[in-house]
Each structure stands twice: as structure tokens, then as C-alpha cells.
Curated annotation (Swiss-Prot):
This is Histone H3 type 2. The record marks 5, 36-37 as: Not N6-acetylated. It is found in: Nucleus; Chromosome. Its main location: nucleus. Acetylation is generally linked to gene activation. Acetylated to form H3K9ac (11%), H3K14ac (17%), H3K18ac (11%), H3K23ac (16%) and H3K27ac (7%). H3K4, H3K35 and H3K36 are not acetylated. H3K4me prevents acetylation. 32% of the histone H3 are acetylated with, on average, 2.4 acetyl-Lys. They are all continuously deacatylated and re-acetylated with a half-life of approximately 2 minutes. Monomethylated to form H3K4me1 (81%), H3K9me1 (16%), H3K27me1 (25%), H3K35me1 (25%) and H3K36me1 (5%). No methylation at H3K14, H3K18 and H3K23. Methylated by a protein complex that includes Mut11. Set1 methylates specifically H3K4. H3K4me1 is associated with silenced euchromatin. Set3 forms H3K9me1, while H3K9me2 is undetected. H3K9me1 is specifically associated with silent, multi-copy transgenes. SUPFAM superfamilies: Histone-fold. Residues 1-40 are annotated as: Disordered. The modification Phosphothreonine is found at residue 12. GO terms for cellular component: nucleosome; nucleus. The record marks 15, 19, 24 as: Not N6-methylated. The modification N6-acetyllysine is found at residues 10, 15, 19, 24, 28. Belongs to the histone H3 family.
């Protein structure tokens, strides 16, 4: 690790910094055998990048086959041996994803209204109640 010049800082009256007693050789890992630790982004950076990525895109985010299995499983409760056109399943998936995106937008607004940045189940419940979906 390269040494950098320290800039003077105004004292805030706390404890004085401890003196470094370890020698330079003991502190530094050997240049040839040192293992470089992987680069990590600061918390939130990757999340914001993902938000921008998914807001730009229009592709479906739920995998097609698991969604199709879910649709068939739910349809079994109403009538057995139902068949679906592939376009019908895609239309259902498009509608389901649009509904979920809208619900999460409203949920986020509920969390922000409560002066939080983390969404919670109570935010989803409030959003659905305001929408009139759940009395």
C-alpha cells in the first residue's frame, strides 16, 4: 500500500492518536506474496446501479417457466386440464409484473412517508389498503 501525505486536521478535543510502534517491515505484507483483496463498492452503490439498469429495461424480470408453473398450479384449483396459449401466459406475466412494480412504487412512497428508506410489510399493507384492494 502506498503511503500518502497526511493533512493537518483541527483537533476536536478527543483522545490523542496512538503512536505506531510496529516497524515498517512488520506492517507491510511481502510485495511478492501479498494477496490483493477484491475490490468492493460502497454500500448502496450497486443497488443504485441496479435500480437504474432495471428502470431502463423493458424485459420481463420473473423467469418464464417458474411463472408458467405457478399459473398452471393456480388454474388447477378452478378447472383441471386447462390449456394455455403461450401468448396468454406472457400476457398474464406482463400484467403481474406491472402490478408488482406499481405496488412496490407505492410501498416505497409509504416507507418514505414514515421517514424510512427500508420497505416493510406494513408499507405493502398500507399501500394495498389505500388502493382499496384490502379493506
Amino acid at each position: 500500500m502506498a503511503r500518502t501525505k497526511q493533512t493537518a486536521r483541527k483537533s476536536t478535543g478527543g483522545k490523542a492518536p496512538r503512536k505506531q510502534l510496529a516497524t515498517k517491515a512488520a506492517r507491510k505484507t511481502p510485495a511478492t506474496g501479498g494477496v490483493k483483496k477484491p475490490h468492493r463498492y460502497r454500500p448502496g452503490t450497486v443497488a443504485l446501479r441496479e435500480i437504474r439498469k432495471y428502470q431502463k429495461s423493458t424485459e420481463l424480470l420473473i423467469r418464464k417457466l417458474p411463472f408458467q408453473r405457478l399459473v398452471r398450479e393456480i388454474a388447477q384449483d378452478f378447472k383441471t386440464d386447462l390449456r394455455f396459449q403461450s401468448q396468454a401466459v406472457l400476457a398474464l406475466q406482463e400484467a403481474a409484473e406491472a402490478y408488482l412494480v406499481g405496488l412496490f412504487e407505492d410501498t416505497n412512497l409509504c416507507a418514505i412517508h414514515a421517514k424510512r428508506v427500508t420497505i416493510m410489510p406494513k408499507d405493502i399493507q398500507l399501500a394495498r389498503r389505500i388502493r382499496g384492494e384490502r379493506a
